[in-house]
Amino acid sequence: FYQGKTITLIVGAGAGGMGDIRARALASVLATHIPGKPTIVFEYMPGAGGRKSANHFFNSVRPDGLTLLRVSSSIVPYAVLGEKGVKYDIDKLNYLGTTEHRLYYMFFTRKEAGLNSLDKLRAANGVRIGSSPVGHTGYIQSRIVAYLLDMKAPKIIPGYEGQDLDVAIGRGEVDGRVATTGTAVQMDLLNKGTADFHTSIEIPRGFKDDRFVHLGLPDIEQFAKSPKEKRLLAMMRGFRAVGTILMLPPGTPKDLVEIMKAAVEKTHADPVFHKEYKKLTGGDDPSPLSPDEQAQVVKELPRDPETVALFKKFAGTDTLPSR
């Protein structure tokens, strides 16, 4: 079927960013594993956190197997949380897996703050936690961590972008933050001894970064006191574990979906892909999730009204709820 054909890969982000780079690392090898070795060309459709491209893909793209979409995982929480502007159904998409789904976050405070134990962290009043803008992943994670650790009147300070938060930590503008291990390595926190680490967020549950295992950090779920709080964490983890999504539109013939699934799995297992991914991303290793596994993550997300309402409280600016 694909002999002599051209596949259009829509990227739900701008050209040149990390989303584009990762898509190119995948596409360059994927084309060699699709029977017929079609040509893959790129289109870019940034906007509305991925909703613009997802809406277009769901409603306007012909399901002929010749158009793919690679888009941020954020389209899933937008749908589950009932956000405005969602004109697609996440349960009708043909998921083709992701090149990255494992993440290990840590909550740490700067050494100068003197919060070198959970008892001291809980006793301190108004600890300043820097985060990304309101509603973003880092903001939500910061509020959930502060809530589950029973911190006293924590001050979540949003609005930081990129390395601005690293600088703010260094200057003492904020006392702590939630960060990936990649950020912690970049800041050289272990070698410099400039941070106290308190808890981790494993995505998926059970995943640990070998570089930080020796710290023995408890996963944040150890601080959950009720099934409600565990569902909240399952939602938070699931939204991230979905990873960046590669998909075919609903209505695509099943045989073409299966051809593409098989090609993606062969790509994920190909050493050439791993080498290309690491080269283009500046040293990152891929952590692939198969098409069926990705679809299962979406299927298992908590969607009950109570959990949705609770999660939205952490995404907003209201005072943290009582436990």
What residues fall within each predicted segment?
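Extracytoplasmic "Venus flytrap"
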Residues: L9-R24, P46-G49, G130-T137
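Mature extracytoplasmic/periplasmic domains
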Residues: A195, E202-D209, I220, E265, ...
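Extracellular/periplasmic bilobal clamshell ligand-binding domains
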Residues: P271, L289-R323
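C-terminal lobe and pocket-closing loops
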Residues: Q186-H268, E306-A309, T317-R323
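Early extracytoplasmic/lumenal segment of secretory-pathway proteins
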Residues: K37-N55
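Mature N-terminal segment immediately following signal peptide/propeptide cleavage
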Residues: F1-I10
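Hinge/capping helix and adjacent helix->loop/strand transition within the periplasmic-binding protein
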Residues: I7, T32-K37, H56-T67, V76-R171, ...
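Beta->alpha turn/N-cap motifs
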Residues: L69-I75, E161-G162, V178-V185, I201-P204, ...
